[in-house]
Amino acid sequence: MSAAEPFFATRLPRLVMFDLDGTLVDSVPDLTAAVDSMLASFGRPPAGIEKVRQWIGNGARVLVRRALAGSIEHDGIGEEETEAALALFMEAYADSHALTEVYPGVVDTLKWLKRNGVEMALITNKPERFVAPLLDEMKLGRYFRWIIGGDTLPQQKPDPAALLFVMKMAGIEPEDALFVGDSRNDVLAAKAAGVRCAALTYGYNHGRPIAEEAPTLVIDNLRDLLPCADQAAEIVLPDDSLSPSDQRDQAVAVSKLWMKVIKALARWRWRA
């Protein structure tokens, strides 16, 4: 049963939590290189980028098991083989993130949210040891007050533990938070935490359209969350060279634009 629920009908969310791979960055090329390097060590043929794209989303261990199985189903893979392959994969992936790219619209969106006082957190199933170096290389780390990796807590998404932990640390209730992701795990974690979820169409969802997971909102670009949603338009951020009074005037103008978008989003409904 569906129930009508406004999508931040009167104000900005106080906290926005983001997934990483498939949401903020396209890391498939580097992950594929590491997977194929691991498979080569076992004398196996490369998996290739399209298969790896469908296997991502449940952490490094599951990715490695899927690569060994050559399928999204991996029940037949033993623990000893998994441990050996995981060590090779981790070593290969630690070498470089040269092929990873930030998706269009991400930096504009993070800048806008930060300038407007919205707290941000990163919650990913990627092992913690890889997260900080990647964020530094992509110049994204500065935007997040809280960063939770796949082994920071005992649980990973779709378990809501990381979302609940961040909200507790921030002192923010679920109705004042938003989760942005790209996969079934992200949507399930958000729903379990009682948080609205915006899901991106371009990410990694095992080859399935993200709309099938029934998030609160489906978007094609992270900039769709902003007042200036026209992809051809440049988002104008507050100018640091302006006087304090002019900056306040500019912030008020941007906030008025955002309120129009929020009222439009109030038409979206939760889907059971």
From Swiss-Prot:
Pathway: Organic acid metabolism; glycolate biosynthesis; glycolate from 2-phosphoglycolate: step 1/1. GO terms for molecular function: metal ion binding; phosphoglycolate phosphatase activity. It is an enzyme of class 3 (hydrolase). Its EC number is 3.1.3.18. Pfam families: HAD_2 (PF13419). Keywords: Carbohydrate metabolism, Hydrolase, Magnesium, Metal-binding. GO terms for cellular component: cytosol. This is Phosphoglycolate phosphatase 1. The gene is gph1. Mg(2+) binds at D19, D21, D182. Specifically catalyzes the dephosphorylation of 2-phosphoglycolate. Is involved in the dissimilation of the intracellular 2-phosphoglycolate formed during the DNA repair of 3'-phosphoglycolate ends, a major class of DNA lesions induced by oxidative stress. The active site is at D19. InterPro entries: HAD-like_hydrolase_sf (IPR050155), HAD-like_sf (IPR036412), HAD-SF_hydro_IA (IPR006439), HAD_2 (IPR041492), HAD_sf (IPR023214), PGP-like_dom2 (IPR023198), PGPase_prok (IPR037512). SUPFAM superfamilies: HAD-like (SSF56784). CDD domains: HAD_PGPase. GO terms for biological process: carbohydrate metabolic process; DNA repair; glycolate biosynthetic process. Belongs to the HAD-like hydrolase superfamily. CbbY/CbbZ/Gph/YieH family. PANTHER family: PHOSPHOGLYCOLATE PHOSPHATASE (PTHR43434:SF1).
